[in-house]
């Protein structure tokens, strides 16, 4: 198991996935995002939702902005919808996937 360059817990299971940053040859760089898993129905991928709130001064109200990301799910990490996970940016793995799951956050 190799050091991937960020401070995350290593998964206990091993996998043979070449797109795994821990057991394969995938390098990560750029953004690190924490969000909630929305869907795991894609084969080997997840949909992640990140919410952010900002104040609109004129109306004294908050606006909620929701961003969705698609991320590759290595075989050594188990997640379900509703779990909070940390994803890291990597090279483009598919048409809409350029992130990989690196840790399940409690």
From Swiss-Prot:
GO terms for biological process: translation. CDD domains: Ribosomal_uS17. The keyword RNA-binding applies. GO terms for cellular component: cytosolic small ribosomal subunit. It comes from the Archaea. InterPro entries: NA-bd_OB-fold, Ribosomal_uS17, Ribosomal_uS17_arc/euk, Ribosomal_uS17_archaeal. GO terms for molecular function: rRNA binding; structural constituent of ribosome. Part of the 30S ribosomal subunit. This is Small ribosomal subunit protein uS17. It comes from Picrophilus torridus (strain ATCC 700027 / DSM 9790 / JCM 10055 / NBRC 100828 / KAW 2/3).
């Amino acid at each position: 198991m190799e050091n991937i360059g960020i401070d995350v817990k290593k998964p206990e299971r091993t996998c043979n996935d070449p797109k795994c940053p821990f057991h394969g040859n995938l390098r990560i760089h750029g953004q690190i995002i924490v969000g909630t898993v929305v869907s795991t129905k894609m084969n080997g991928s997840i949909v992640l939702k990140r919410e952010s709130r900002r104040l609109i001064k004129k109306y004294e109200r908050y606006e909620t902005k929701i961003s969705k990301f698609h991320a590759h799910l290595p075989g050594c990490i188990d997640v379900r919808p509703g779990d909070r996970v940390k994803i890291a940016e990597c090279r483009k793995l598919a048409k809409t996937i350029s992130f990989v799951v690196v840790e399940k956050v409690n």
